[in-house]
């Protein structure tokens, strides 16, 4: 299939990578798995046995007229433990490589279909100045954009770092969440070829 390039003639790309059907279920699974993998999972609270103290019972079992109490660290007491305390856990979800690649292909195909993929021959800035990059993006009418190249250019990365709705990634650093999070994805021809290699 043909893919239009902004500043050059159209290029021939793989139908498998850029022309497949959109599998919403698979993309959803990939996005959820990716975001779950980013969770720290280190939350921890103390149960009645974790709270320091409370070894000796506050008063005897019988004869006081008060409700029986075995420890001052009971969850119903002030200063006691938490009833269902949070424990550290691994939130990561298993996603086969084959499924991940299929989800990425599905996202790229949908970006092409909805005219959200802007292909350019090359994209770089001479100096690491935000003003220069902003001027370039304004000329292309891009405000909310992910810039993907085959390798991250240091000047480009530094220039984009302070822009709120602009991100720069290389092909290896692209993920399902970043690809669908922006209005447009600006991608270089070399990055397109790299995606074909990795996902083909």
Curated annotation (Swiss-Prot):
Keywords: Ribonucleoprotein, Ribosomal protein, RNA-binding, rRNA-binding
Disulfide bonds: none
One GO-annotated biological process of the protein: translation
Ribonucleoprotein found in the keyword field: yes
Gene3D superfamilies for the chain: 3.40.1370.10
InterPro entries linked to this entry: Ribosomal_uL4 (IPR002136), Ribosomal_uL4-like (IPR013005), Ribosomal_uL4_dom_sf (IPR023574)
Gene Ontology terms: cellular component: ribonucleoprotein complex; ribosome
Residue segments, region Disordered: 38-72
Presence of the UniProt keyword rRNA-binding in the record: yes
GO molecular function, one term: structural constituent of ribosome
Quaternary state and interactors: Part of the 50S ribosomal subunit.
Protein family per UniProt: Belongs to the universal ribosomal protein uL4 family.
Free-text function comment from the UniProt entry: One of the primary rRNA binding proteins, this protein initially binds near the 5'-end of the 23S rRNA. It is important during the early stages of 50S assembly. It makes multiple contacts with different domains of the 23S rRNA in the assembled 50S subunit and ribosome.
Protein name: Large ribosomal subunit protein uL4
Originating species: Pseudomonas fluorescens (strain ATCC BAA-477 / NRRL B-23932 / Pf-5)
